[in-house]
């Protein structure tokens, strides 16, 4: 059958109080991308005992239909992610639908679900960021042949400073993409052998995603600087 679609928030913004056979969960979480397309939600929660918070951090899983979805994703960009808040109040979650953050082991789903955290999402963020950067660069290159800026009669594409900028941006995007792919290949090979990538590779994947996002942002800002907002 099909893979159930899930969404959620890893941040421990909820409270889970032990109850007979499970937990009573309260909380409101943000940035639940894709929530309106999901069947299940996973929510980070702090365990509360005798009215006091503990240092125990778990994730609870429950049907999306059990949560209130708050229509508060009113943004200028990324509208398509639909990253609305969601909340629950005194929701009973069975013990079997909770798991500790640090010791979670994939039970099914193949190598994709053995990539681990944060590697599992790092490559998704990288792909989006690099795509935005590449689109910005391709757009200004496509317009440069006809664009004239300021009082100079020459086309933007013929100016050495513009050519240098485009070349540097292109190389930086390629380098960031190559690094992301290299690390993902290493992680994927381990996952295919039943191994969850360890802390070093997880850190490298996260760092590569941060680096790719930084490069993409630089490219977009350079595109605006070189061509203007129109």
Label every model-predicted segment.
Residues 138, 142-145, 178-181, 185-188, ...:
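Charged/polar positions within long, soluble alpha-helices
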């Amino acid at each position: 059958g099909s893979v159930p679609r899930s969404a959620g928030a890893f941040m421990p913004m909820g409270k889970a109080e032990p109850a007979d056979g499970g937990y009573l969960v309260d909380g409101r979480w943000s940035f639940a991308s894709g929530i309106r397309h999901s069947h299940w939600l996973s929510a980070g929660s702090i365990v509360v005992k005798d009215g006091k918070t503990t240092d125990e951090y778990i994730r609870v899983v429950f049907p999306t239909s059990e949560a209130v979805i708050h229509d508060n994703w009113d943004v200028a960009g990324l509208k398509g992610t639909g990253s609305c808040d969601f909340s629950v109040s005194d929701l009973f979650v069975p013990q079997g639908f909770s798991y500790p953050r640090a010791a979670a082991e994939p039970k099914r789903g193949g190598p994709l679900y053995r990539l681990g955290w944060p590697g599992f999402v790092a490559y998704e963020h990288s792909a989006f960021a690099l795509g935005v950067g590449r689109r910005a660069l391709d757009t200004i290159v496509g317009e440069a042949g006809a664009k004239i800026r300021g009082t100079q009669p020459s086309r933007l594409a013929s100016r050495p400073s513009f050519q240098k900028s485009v070349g540097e941006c292109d190389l930086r995007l390629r380098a960031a993409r190559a690094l992301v792919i290299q690390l993902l290949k290493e992680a994927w090979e381990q996952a295919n052998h039943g191994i969850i990538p360890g802390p070093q590779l997880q850190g490298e994947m996260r760092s590569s995603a941060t680096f790719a996002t930084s490069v993409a942002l630089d490219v977009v800002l350079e595109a605006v600087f070189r061509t203007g907002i129109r």
